[in-house]
Swiss-Prot record:
It comes from Nocardioides sp. (strain ATCC BAA-499 / JS614). This is Homoserine O-succinyltransferase. Signal peptide: none annotated. It is an enzyme of class 2 (transferase). It catalyses: L-homoserine + succinyl-CoA = O-succinyl-L-homoserine + CoA. Residues 49-328 form the AB hydrolase-1 domain. Substrate binds at residues 224, 351. The gene is metXS. One of its GO terms (molecular function) is homoserine O-acetyltransferase activity. HAMAP family: MetX_acyltransf.
């Protein structure tokens, strides 16, 4: 029976220390790595029913259920739970915050053990492999050798792809939704505008704003407003807002007037305090550099994998449109990888992966088996 998980709790674990640091793809290292995570369901005696959830850019470990004192359900609660596509009556589900994030895992605002102060811009640049490496340590900490599946949308889908490249035998199934193997110039341009808005804010303070007791919220708000436009579709904006204004007649103003403007103002405002500007800079830049099929080692890794891939795109998603899933499918098939891709109809744009367009949840449920 489909139902709710009820109350869940975010846990934290230290997965790297001075004697066992996390060595990064770019040559640096982190002597202290903490990861925030949640688990749902029960691990089978054979430890073979684990499903790892990889979140998108501004997500966190709270993918499903409720926290005590909050009415806000996890960001993928419609997908994860008893009787749902990621069925917690059958699967042991792990959801963890990304390395470089700001919701409990080590990131730019974490304390640098060498200085006792926040890393800020001294935090090392990250590669997608570094995000995978931190989560691989979490999986090992939980006593799991092989995952039944990893499921991710947007950036999370890219992490799933990198996971198979880095550990070709670690996943039985890989589910990528609204993802890409390489950002388009348009996507890179959107992120560049967001970073420029943040770094041009007078309160950015060369990245050390926390020590000054301020936050670059004006720039961060603009960055979120800009990004949010790319998460929805022209159709959904037209349906929701049309050309409606709040003022009447000839009462024109330079301030927000159209309903869509107020909507973007709200989206930008609620982002403040929920996500950190430095994590936004680091993770959007990581996405820009993500291009695994340009690495000669990728082909050899994928030729050896038995992991089965499922790719899903949405016809109204212009952030990661279906041509990007088509390219990934061709890249994988050329290496002999088992892959199934489908484009689904949805009016909701990129955010479709968080919602329930027809056929989407059924598709994932069937693939997970």
């Amino acid at each position: 029976m489909t139902g709710s998980l009820g109350y869940v709790e975010t846990q934290r674990v230290v997965l790297a220390g001075p004697d066992d640091p996390l060595h990064l793809r770019g040559g640096g290292r982190l002597d202290h790595v903490e990861v925030a995570y949640e688990t749902y369901g029960s691990l089978s005696p054979a430890r073979d029913n684990a499903v790892f959830i990889c979140h998108a850019l501004t997500g966190d470990a709270h993918a499903a259920g409720l926290h005590v004192g909050s009415k806000k359900r996890g960001w993928w609660d419609n997908l994860i739970g008893p009787g749902k596509p990621v069925d917690t009556d059958r699967f042991f589900v792990i959801s963890a915050n990304l390395l470089g994030g700001c919701s409990g895992s080590t990131g730019p605002l974490s304390t640098d053990p060498a200085t006792g102060a926040p890393y800020c811009l001294d935090f090392p640049m990250l590669h997608m492999s570094d995000l995978v490496a931190a989560h691989r340590r979490l999986v090992a900490h939980l006593g799991i050798e092989r995952l039944h599946a990893a499921v991710g949308g947007s950036l999370g889908g890219m992490q799933v792809l990198q996971w198979v490249i880095d550990e070709p035998d670690a996943l039985e199934r890989a589910v990528l939704v609204a993802a890409s193997s390489r950002l388009s110039p348009e996507n890179i341009a959107f992120s560049a505008i967001g970073r420029e808005a943040i770094m041009s804010d007078p309160d950015f303070c060369n990245g050390r704003y926390v020590e000054q007791g301020v936050f670059p919220w004006r720039g961060q708000k603009v960055a979120r407003m800009m990004a949010h436009i790319t998460y929805v579709s022209a159709q959904s904006l037209e349906t929701k807002f049309g050309h409606r204004r709040r003022s009447r007649g000839d009462a024109w103003t330079l301030g927000p007037d159209y309903e869509v403007e107020h909507y973007l103002q709200h989206q930008g405002q609620v982002f403040l305090g929920r996500f950190d500007a430095l994590s936004y800079l680091y993770l959007t830049r990581l996405l820009d550099y993500f291009d695994p099929f340009a690495d000669p080692g990728t082909a050899a890794a994928l030729r050896s994998t038995a992991t089965r891939f499922q790719l899903t795109s949405f016809d109204s998603d212009w952030r990661f449109d279906s041509t990007q899933s088509a390219r990934m499918t061709a890249e994988l098939k050329a290496l002999g990888v088992a892959v199934d891709w489908a484009e689904l109809a949805s009016p909701f744009g990129h955010d479709s992966f968080l919602l329930q367009p027809p056929g989407y949840h059924e598709r994932i449920a069937e693939f997970l088996g």
